[in-house]
Amino acid sequence: MVHLTPEEKSAVTALWGKVNVDEVGGEALGRLLVVYPWTQRFFESFGDLSTPDAVMGNPKVKAHGKKVLGAFSDGLAHLDNLKGTFATLSELHCDKLHVDPENFRLLGNVLVCVLAHHFGKEFTPPVQAAYQKVVAGVANALAHKYH
């Protein structure tokens, strides 16, 4: 559960309505893989991830980034039940994929940076603070099965 004021919730949903999930998803996942290269080990089947250009241009990275942001969109629709919304994904990432839960926090922070880059002045400090709450809540929900 994420505790947002009505103003924060409105700001998050208003901005999210303008997000191009295809573009932002691929960019966020790509930047994660470039900035934190150890995360690439979970994506060995994606082919060439040898350079930043290869990562950012990789169609499998873009497609998976879109999928990730699709799940994030579902979370935004269920902010009062993030653990329930992400229970299946938490179980998958914990039991089958063995993803370090710290990676969820890292991806959330990268997503905030990508949103700031895309929206510039519209991504005000209050909007950023609200998004930081949301990505922290999503990361905690995804890490839930690890506890």
Swiss-Prot record:
Modified residues (Phosphoserine): S10, S45
Effect of E23A: In G-Coushatta/G-Saskatoon/G-Taegu/Hsin Chu
Residues where heme b binds: H64, H93
Protein's recorded name: Hemoglobin subunit beta
Disease the record associates with this protein: Heinz body anemias: Form of non-spherocytic hemolytic anemia of Dacie type 1. After splenectomy, which has little benefit, basophilic inclusions called Heinz bodies are demonstrable in the erythrocytes. Before splenectomy, diffuse or punctate basophilia may be evident. Most of these cases are probably instances of hemoglobinopathy. The hemoglobin demonstrates heat lability. Heinz bodies are observed also with the Ivemark syndrome (asplenia with cardiovascular anomalies) and with glutathione peroxidase deficiency.
Function according to Swiss-Prot or TrEMBL: Involved in oxygen transport from the lung to the various peripheral tissues.
UniProt-reported outcome of changing D22G: In Connecticut; O(2) affinity down
Pfam families: Globin (PF00042)
Effect of H93D: In J-Altgelds Gardens; unstable
Keyword Heme annotated: yes
Outcome of swapping V12D: In Windsor; O(2) affinity up; unstable
Outcome following mutation: Q132R: In Sarrebourg; unstable
Phenotype when changing V2A: In Raleigh; O(2) affinity down
Effect noted on mutating H78R: In Costa Rica
Effect upon mutating A130P: In Crete; O(2) affinity up; unstable
Positions of modified residues (N-pyruvate 2-iminyl-valine): V2
Keyword Metal-binding: yes
GO biological process: blood vessel diameter maintenance; carbon dioxide transport; cellular oxidant detoxification; hydrogen peroxide catabolic process; inflammatory response; nitric oxide transport; oxygen transport; platelet aggregation
Tissue expression: Red blood cells.
Mutagenesis / variant outcome for changing K67T: In Chico; O(2) affinity down
